[in-house]
Amino acid sequence: MSDEVVTGMNGGTGSRRIGVYVCGCGGNISDYVSVDDVVAAVQDEPGVVVARTAMFTCSDATQQEIINDIQERNLDGIVVASCSPKLHTFTFREMSKRAGLNPYEYTQVNIREQCSWTHTDDRAGATGKAARLVRAGIARTGLTEPLEPVVVETIPKVVVIGGGIAGMRAALGLAEIGLAVFLVEKETELGGWVAGFAEMYPHGKDGRGLVTRLEEKIRRHPRITVFTDAEVVGKSGSFGNYEVNIRVGRERPEATVRETNSLETLTVEAGSIVVATGFDSYAPQAGEFGYGLDGVLTLPDFKRLVDSSDGPLSYHGTPVRTIVYVYCVGSRQPEGNEYCSRYCCTAAIHNSLQVTAKAAPAGAAPGAAAPRISQYHLYRDIRSYGKYEILYNESREKGGLYLRFPDDEAPVVAQASVGAKAGGGSASGAGHSHRLTVTTRDLLTGGAELIIPADLVVLVTGMVPRENDDLVKTLKLPVGNDGFFNEIHPKLRPVETVVDGVFICGACQGPKNSAEAVASGLAAVTQSASILKRGYAELDPLIAVVDPDACEWCGLCLEACPYEAPRRVEEGGEAVGDPRKAVAVIDRAACKGCGGCVPVCPKNAIDLLGYSDAQIRAMIDGLLQEVTPCRM
């Protein structure tokens, strides 16, 4: 932090004593915004006692200096002008607590995303805008009041939606911690995609066996109730006290149903919900990379073919000598899904090595020649990251040929002419007929055009989000542009959603391999159990409040609320002084403080704690004030 302490001219003689801290963010802000000029512009605002600059306000050293200011100068409010509140709101709230300041007397002002990163070509304009934003933050802080978290009791039960590997592991983890679990699976069997796998990398375990062992533990566990052929169709209540409606598609044995209203629709109580609905594999369109031609298979179809083979691979009774893999089908395509599916490069390489291994059966005599399998990998980029690069190196050592095609010139798959045979120089051997040809260009050989005869073409298909429209509406889940569920922050809060008590894990939040899916499932276990095991949860108090004297229930607030937080209370009674009056009451646990109900109220009966009408007006006044031009 800067050694200079700039004290406001008013010396903080008003009713508030506010500290202002302007961050340079290691040049991210200070290279485009004059942080010294920002301090100079706001130091004389009413209530400002101290105003400083800092290289990194989030650093431990600077936080300690702010704590010292709060304690030594008796500050009752602080403004931190730095980066996005999404990144450091909790950082500075916790810092405020350590200093003895109510955490809701702190205001974060975003001058990085909103100023320095936005106006890189206009230092004076960015500085002036930053000064106005900080002034607005000071105005808001001057009207803040100490708030306490909303405390709600929690039910020690969890609904896990999805019985794939992530959901199963999450359910077992929650039960082992001591929570009751309702595991809801849409299909008739548990296991998801992994239940159909044979050998898996890197542990070499059989996917079917892994799922079977996990299911046996789940079925035996007294705290887990399993509903297959079922889906969640309704939710009411709020974090810690949800009521979840489960529709069972067929009659269940009475022994498997607990806490039920009927055999068709069950209502269970739960403190939290874990969503692990998984993914679907990309389904190519007819004609896409030759899809629909005999011998063109998707990666899941090819894996089933390999897993079912006990020896050298054959297709429709014909030995397979040449396989061409086309990578990034359904991923990294501007006209389709632009994201990388992460797992498919490794999965394709692993399958190709299994093909090579099965070409030489374990019982073959030493030195016996194995049928030659030529395998061509046509790729944009190979992304077998981390330890999975071992597979890539092994594949190349065992003869796999990797050809990189241009982004704007994808391989062309066509049916081979009837009776077409490879020439004597073909890797598959003279006289061997091929079903298909693949034409591509290889950037690693100067863009040379290659025509590869093939017995099989494997389209290495990626992951796509599962169709979950009804579940999205039921749980109010946020969905990203890619169609997967959105977490709050991929690094800091990777399994939490904006809906309190609803967690996501596995491939429903984005492409993952099985190990990553299990890891995220266990992360959801940790987050859920850390709240439910203690019996209560603390929620943000920045929520809507209703003036019962002004309210005359019209229902507009309920229509505007995506979380159904406003509730109609009949005959207000003593709370409103009129037993015949109906008013709105906000469910404090359900409200997220979005403010959508405030402007629609015709009686102006709703206000938002932390962002009241008075605070918003004061912030607008601060934004409209002139600022001294930047010294550049």
Can you annotate each of these PLM segments?
Residues 2-632:
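Residues forming the flavin
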